[in-house]
C-alpha cells in the first residue's frame, strides 16, 4: 500500500477478477444524507470527465476506487479525477 498524494492510497484491486492497481480514499460524513450528497457530486464530476469510479456508500462513509479498467492500471484519468474529487 503506497500513498499516492492527497491521502489517496494505491491498492491491488480485483473489480472484474483480474488484478490491477487502483487509487482508494475514504471520506467520512456526519450522516447518510451528507454521504449521499457527496456521492452525487462525485457522479457529476465523473460524467463530465467520462471516467467513472467504483463507489461504496454506507452510513457516514464513502469509499472511492479509481482505476482505468481498460488499461488495468492507474492512469492520468484517475489522478485527474482524484484531484477534482478532493476539491469538492
Named regions from a protein language model:
Residues 2-36, 40-61, 65-88:
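Long, contiguous binding/interaction regions
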Amino acid at each position: 500500500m503506497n500513498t499516492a498524494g492527497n491521502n489517496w492510497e494505491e491498492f491491488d484491486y480485483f473489480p472484474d477478477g483480474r488484478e490491477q492497481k487502483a487509487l482508494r480514499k475514504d471520506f467520512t460524513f456526519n450522516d447518510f444524507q451528507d454521504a449521499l450528497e457527496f456521492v452525487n457530486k462525485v457522479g457529476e464530476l465523473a460524467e463530465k470527465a467520462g471516467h467513472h469510479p467504483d463507489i461504496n456508500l454506507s452510513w457516514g462513509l464513502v469509499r472511492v476506487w479509481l482505476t482505468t479498467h481498460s488499461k488495468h492500471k492507474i492512469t492520468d484519468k484517475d489522478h485527474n479525477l482524484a484531484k477534482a474529487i478532493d476539491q469538492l
